[in-house]
Amino acid sequence: IILNDPDAMVVVIPDLYPPNVAFTHSTAKELFEGIQRNFLEILHQKKVKDEKSFIQRLKVFCFKYDLEALLLAAEDERRKFLGMKFLKRQWTIPVEDQNHENPPKKIVEKLFQKSGNQYNQVIDAPLILKKCNDWDIAEACQQCFKPFIEFLECVS
């Protein structure tokens, strides 16, 4: 598509966690650079001219973790969904700064267990996040999610 449509863009939204999948990376910068390298290799293999034009149309928004980081940011909506009046926060703020040993997905699973529920990413995450304001979540996830929301605002 990007080869045949000069207005097309490629938008990539990988998770930083787990690290070192596909290529070595432990930071968002390393993940971004690795994706760019792989993209350039594909352009070389296809003997594409004017690589700069294609690189400019590659947009990479590296989420640090799975979408569960967004669920941690959606405190009120998550708490209401779980039917809990009070929930002691036992994670790092900003939510994008969790560590790989205790990623947001594990934290969310524990929160669901405490409420007597089992977390199902496919069902529960959309039900919680659809009640959220994108910009409220973006303000809580400024490192990686906010730039993506800003990008979406520009292309809408």
Summary of predicted features, one role per range:
Residues 2-156:
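C-terminal accessory helical subdomains adjacent to catalytic cores in phosphodiester-
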